[in-house]
Design a protein with these regions (language model features):
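C-terminal extensions of enzymes
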Residues: 126, 132-223
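Sequence-level detector for tyrosine residue identity
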Residues: 37, 43, 75, 102, ...
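Active-site acidic/histidine proton-transfer and metal-coordination neighborhood
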Residues: 1-51, 142, 177-180, 208-211
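Short, well-ordered coil/turn segments that N-cap beta-strands
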Residues: 8-14, 45-49, 75-79, 115-120, ...
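Gly/Pro-rich active-site loop or hairpin
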Residues: 26-34, 59-146
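Alpha-helical structural signal in soluble globular domains
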Residues: 5, 39-43, 71, 75, ...
Length: 223
């Protein structure tokens, strides 16, 4: 179902407030999204407020944008996003126009998994660079940002249609479908029984994640 209710509005104690941004370092920004939603939960405001997330602020917090969007989505709290990108080296809120298709693909994938994004949608909280001073640069920058998100959406739609991430997760957590894994999920095991199981099954064969191959396959969707 699409994210949002008709009466909801978007807030972000951590993700798009200049006050918060200037008051805290990148290290202390890290837990503030969870703190924001904890405040919403504490006062029973889940039906009234959702979070606005900004890509550049995720960078400052040491997170990926898709990680923060995923966390918000899991709590049904994804209300809007500020579409921009930051400089990975500066440690400040540069609010660049988004041009990284890899990032926008993963961001749009979270939006598709969310069933859409509402009530706020996608906002270009972006600025042209100091050297882009001609009038046409503002138009060209918006075109670049919109095209980047559009290409990200097309790639994300294909990822979702072909169950790229779903199949990876299904395989990774297949051991929870039967045996000891299934019993853990059904609360049939205790710490004592799991300790005993570990002692009796010490030589467990690990499976490779083939992570480099997975990233290579992800690149194929972006071309």
């Amino acid at each position: 179902m699409p994210c949002g209710v008709s009466s909801a509005c978007c807030i972000s104690f951590s993700t798009s407030s200049v006050i918060w941004e200037r008051a805290f370092s990148a290290e202390t920004l890290m837990p503030l999204i969870s703190a924001s939603y904890s405040t919403i939960q504490k006062y029973g405001l889940e039906g009234d407020f959702k979070l606005n997330l900004e890509a550049n602020h995720a960078t400052l917090a040491g997170h990926t944008f898709e990680h923060e969007m995923n966390v918000a989505r899991c709590y049904d709290a994804l209300g809007s996003i500020d579409a921009n990108q930051g400089d990975m080296l500066l440690g400040w809120d540069t609010d660049e126009f988004p041009t990284n298709i890899y990032d926008t693909t993963l961001a749009m994938y979270e939006i598709l998994e969310n069933g859409g994004i509402a009530p706020g949608g996608i906002n270009f909280d972006s600025k042209v660079r100091r050297s882009s001073f001609e009038m046409e640069d503002l138009l060209l920058a918006h075109i670049a940002g919109m095209d980047t998100f559009a290409r990200g959406l097309k790639a994300a739609a294909k990822l979702k249609e072909e169950r790229f991430f779903d199949d990876l997760k299904d395989k990774r957590y297949a051991s929870y479908n039967e045996g000891i894994g299934a019993r853990i999920l059904s609360d049939e095991e205790t710490l004592e029984s799991l300790t005993e199981y570990s002692l009796q099954n010490g030589d467990i064969k690990l499976e490779s994640s083939h992570l480099e191959f997975v990233k290579s396959r992800l690149n194929d969707y972006l071309v």
